[in-house]
A protein has these predicted regions:
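Short, high-confidence coil segments that cap the C-terminus of an alpha-helix
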Residues: 35-36, 95, 111
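Acidic, metal-binding active-site segment of PIN/NYN-like and related structure-specific nucleases
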Residues: 100-128
Length: 128
């Protein structure tokens, strides 16, 4: 399973970086063709919505359109257990808490790949 980080979603909507936008479009297109292989975190959707509203100055209806498009994929909420695990991940890997929460949510949902530009290529993070 592949977990899609917030920045992939952001680049999908970003009109300023065509190269990263094309990569993001490819990832999301593959996710739409193979929805059983991908997971989005509810947190990532919230962060994406915030960036679209504040940074990209999109109106709420446009953001809803993006969310509707993405709603065909599995959406994973986070739990208290994920929050506790995120604290372990944050401490062990010196990551930001919300990045750690996404990683903990991915791990809890059986993901073996975390699609992001925030980690080093091939970096492996586990909370244990």
């Amino acid at each position: 399973m592949k977990f899609v980080d917030t920045n992939v979603l952001v680049y999908l909507a970003d009109r300023h970086d065509a190269g990263k936008r094309e990569i993001a479009k490819g990832i999301i297109a593959d996710a739409m063709r193979n929805p059983e292989e991908y997971i989005l975190g509810a947190q990532a959707l919230a962060e994406f919505s915030n960036v679209c509203l504040r940074k990209f100055k999109m109106d709420a209806d446009t953001v809803r359109d993006y969310l509707g498009f993405l709603s065909g994929l599995k959406i994973a909420p986070y739990t208290l257990t994920n929050v506790e695990r995120a604290l372990e991940v944050k401490t062990k890997y010196q990551l930001q808490f919300f990045d750690s929460l996404l990683l903990a949510t991915a791990e809890a949902n059986g993901c073996d790949t975390f699609l992001s530009e925030d980690l080093n290529s091939g970096q492996v993070c586990t909370a244990a």
